Amino acid sequence: MTEVQSSVIEGWSIESTLPKKSEVEKLAELVPAGTEVYLSTLPHVSLDQQIETAHIVRVNGLEPVLHVAARYFATRTELVGYLARAGRETAAENMLIIGGDADRPNGEFDSALSLIKSGLLSDYGIRRIGVAGYPDGHPKISSDALIEALGAKIETAQAAGIAPHITTQFCFEAAPILAWLKDIRERWPDVPVKIGIAGPTGFKTLLKFAVRCGVNTPRTGIAQKLTMASKIAKTFSPGDLLDDLDTGLGQIGGGNLSAHFFSFGGLEKTATWIAGRLNEKSNFTGTNETQRMQL
């Protein structure tokens, strides 16, 4: 029987878009070597910029995980060149494969699944891939369609000898995450899941990203909740959400769950907060163990 984790912060990763060299160097001082740094892509971010940033992450002893947006590639040749360069300059073995925000595909790849099906990932040394999960749903795609697409991506990757994991959109409440995880664990009990969580961030900044990423929906009522919370504190903190998730882990069972932090408030600020959280957990565990031994 798989041991249940004590906290989702175990094995955490962090995400940014185009962090500066100085920001990456500072991050490397704060976090363990080999920490995964996901590098997101947007329409205004060039492939050159993304790979150059991944190279900086790699030479600083961290593990870059490139977001690869299928719809951004105009030709198969362009994708081949990108994968070859990623392997050559960043030693990439792990990527997050997404469809991308473009309304229309620039070429033959219209979805993450079509790119995974191409067979090019394993040809260029990719051994692990992340695929997107949406515990809070998607504003344009039904829940049934999301699950069907997720299953197809997982099965296609596994058939190609690539180990898949699920990286989710960031969420604000534990209940929908735990309900979604329960369903995922029943379908794919051994597939690792990275739970998207916003790091410490100003409420105005957080709301901007929530709207941009489709997290702010009428059903979730996030805009109203963030507005109310901003009257109590200046900065959003994910501590309560992590506490609620840790409490709910026993209901789901199994391991292979970890937090994936979106560093909307900056890499250094997020990493510093994580270090503090880990220190708190360590002290709490140590205190409980001491008390147990004295009984």
Protein language model features and the residues they cover:
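Active-site beta->alpha loop and helix N-cap motifs at the rims of alpha/beta catalytic domains
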Residues: 2-150, 155, 266, 276
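Active-site pocket-lining/capping segments in soluble small-molecule metabolic enzymes
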Residues: 15-20, 98, 111-136, 149, ...
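A short acidic (Asp/Glu
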Residues: 49-50, 76-79, 175-182, 206-207, ...
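Conserved, mostly hydrophobic/aromatic
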Residues: 66, 153, 162, 195, ...
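A short, acidic, flexible beta-alpha connecting loop/helix-capping segment that sits on the rim
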Residues: 261-269
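Short, well-ordered secondary-structure micro-motifs
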Residues: 107-108, 141-143, 178-179, 204-212, ...
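Glycine- and other small-residue-rich loops at beta-strand/loop junctions that grip anionic moieties
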Residues: 16, 42, 71, 142, ...
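Hydrophobic, aromatic-enriched interface-forming segments
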Residues: 140-159, 163-185
